[in-house]
Amino acid sequence: LLQLLMGFTRLDNAPQLGMVAIIGMSVCDVAFNLVAVCALGLGLWGMGAATALAYCVAVAICCTHFASKRNTLRLVNPLPHLGKLSSVLKIGLPDSLTRVTVMLRTFTFNWLLLVVASGAAVAALSMLSSVNSFASSVTIGVGQTATLLCGIFFGEEDRAALKATLRTGLRMGLMLSCALCAAVFVFAPQVVGLFGLDGEAAAFGVVAVRAFMLCVPIDLINQLFVSYYQSTGNVRAASAIAVGQSGLFAVLFALCTVWTWGAVGVWMSFLVGEAITLALQVVVACVLWKRRRAKAGSVDVAGTLATGLPAPAGPVRASLLDKMMYLPETFQVDWLADQAFSCKPNIESVVECSRNVAAWCQAQGIDGRRAYLIPLAVEEMASNAVEYGFAKTKHPAIDVKLILKRDGTLMLRMRDNGAPFNPMDLDLSAADPYSAVGIRMLRQGVRGVEYQNTVGLNNVVVTLSVSA
């Protein structure tokens, strides 16, 4: 239920609420465990009840969105939408596999610790689940944010934006996770003490926490790619990673080492499981990329000979990230040319951006009507964002992208982080008939207009055919 609600709030422009819910759950989990163990003396049963109650707090935090003025979600009759159930279940398969694998891993680890160690080690493992909940505030937050953005960029077939999103997620996520790991690793005795563990259980707990924190940065990478593959429809890859990182390799490693290493084999299994999962991702991606490029090379030669047109290709010198993206062969295959423009949130920069757009259209041989219409529309929509959309935006930004397809279709994509506003909904009935000429002409001559506001971004996609 919590994951479902977090998905709804992210889609409804409240992505920060999910992070607040995770942090609130983690804090409450620690506090409730302290009360259950130290004040009430409820032991393991109390720790389990405290964790369940912490999840209820997170659900309650997410539910506050439905009472806010920004909420646009409404209950509907689900019966007409039953046909979409299979695709929903397919997309959610990795999450389901994660839950099942974690359950089996927990059962196996509890049994192993009881056999080779003691009940104190089991108590340390239970405490470790609470620490994991706290650490997941970073890994889940980065992964879920990437899911939304990658879904948008994949639908737009924007390879550069997809790659930039993954790079940013990796860079920022690793910085946060490494800082968190360093702090918890150093203060592991104090962290364990918060849960009321002492004696043998505390000794097990310190080793467990320090060993576990080493795997969090790798877990972030794996989680980020699970989210990316889910958003791009690669359920097979997402499911494989989910099973691997959630427990398959960890359980196998623990079963092989616990008889000689004791409880340390269990604690180290988290790191080993995540590392093996990541290593296998890299190996498989490199092998499949090599096979794919070899196959694509022969096909491209045949296509060029048959049509006389140069075959579109992906990056010539592919990075490891390119190889791990697994973009379909049809991705951007119909693109002839594209160009991205950025403008600062001021009128002078907007005018300059419009001129650059006009110059690009002229360089690409765009017909006169569209070469006049597109720069004018860009200037009007960007000016509207500058004048009215950024009053409450700390770091305003406007991005423009033009795509010329092989059939002559021209696509305009504009994105800004201002207040939600669809320029196609602008009421021009009472306005000056000579104002917003570009937007007026767009309404009359476009083949299609799409608008959505997701994670605080206005996204407008305008498609103009050759005859527009």
What is each stretch, according to the model?
Residues 300-341, 444-468:
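Flexible, glycine-/charge-rich segments associated with ATP-binding catalytic modules
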Residues 1, 28, 37-93, 150-215, ...:
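Short alpha-helical transmembrane segments in multi-pass integral membrane proteins
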Residues 35-42, 103-130, 134, 152, ...:
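Helix-terminus/linker motif at the lipid-water interface of multi-pass membrane proteins
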Residues 1-11, 18-29, 47-62, 140-143, ...:
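Short runs within selected transmembrane alpha-helices of multi-pass transporters and secretion channels
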Residues 2-18, 122-182, 186, 220-233, ...:
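Small-residue-rich hydrophobic transmembrane alpha-helices
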Residues 395-403:
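A conserved short beta-strand within the histidine kinase catalytic ATPase domain
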